[in-house]
Design a protein with these regions (language model features):
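N-terminal presequence-like segments and adjacent domain-start helices
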Residues: 1-31
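Short, non-transmembrane amphipathic alpha-helical segments
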Residues: 22-37, 69-97
C-alpha cells in the first residue's frame, strides 16, 4: 500500500492548479486562433491543444483536406499560423504565465479519416 504524504498531496494540488490555469488560457486562445485563420483565408478545420502540466503545450492544427495542407505548407501559411498563435498566446498572457514552449503539428482531416479511421486520439498519439 502506498502512503501519500502531505508534501506529495501539496505537489499534486499545485500541479492541478497549473493544469486548470493552462487550460483556461488555451480556451481563450482557441477562438482567437480560429478567427485569425478565417480572416486570413486559411480556415482551420480542427485544433487540439495538449498541455503538459505547465511545462509546455502541443498544438495540433488540422485543415480539411490534404490539398489545403500542402498549399499552406508551400505558401508559408504554416509559418504565419505558428507566428499568429504565438502572438495570441503572448497577448492573452499565456507566455508570461507559463513559457513559449509550444510544439506545433499540422495535418488534415482527410489524412485522419484515411489513416486513423477518423480517430483523432490515435492520430494525436503518433506525434
Amino acid at each position: 500500500m502506498y502512503i501519500i504524504t502531505q508534501e506529495m498531496e501539496n505537489e499534486i494540488q499545485e500541479m492541478d492548479k497549473k493544469n486548470f490555469k493552462q487550460w483556461d488560457y488555451l480556451k481563450k486562445a482557441i477562438p482567437r486562433i480560429i478567427h485569425w485563420s478565417k480572416k486570413n483565408n486559411c480556415r482551420i478545420y480542427r485544433i487540439h491543444c495538449i498541455p503538459h502540466s505547465g511545462i509546455s503545450v502541443d498544438i495540433c492544427i488540422f485543415y480539411k483536406t490534404d490539398k489545403e495542407l500542402n498549399i499552406y505548407k508551400e505558401s508559408n501559411i504554416i509559418d504565419l499560423t505558428k507566428e499568429a498563435v504565438m502572438n495570441i498566446l503572448t497577448e492573452i498572457g499565456y507566455v508570461e504565465e507559463f513559457n513559449d514552449k509550444v510544439r506545433f503539428s499540422f495535418d488534415s482531416d482527410e489524412n485522419v479519416q484515411r489513416k486513423y479511421l477518423g480517430n483523432y486520439g490515435l492520430r494525436l498519439h503518433d506525434d
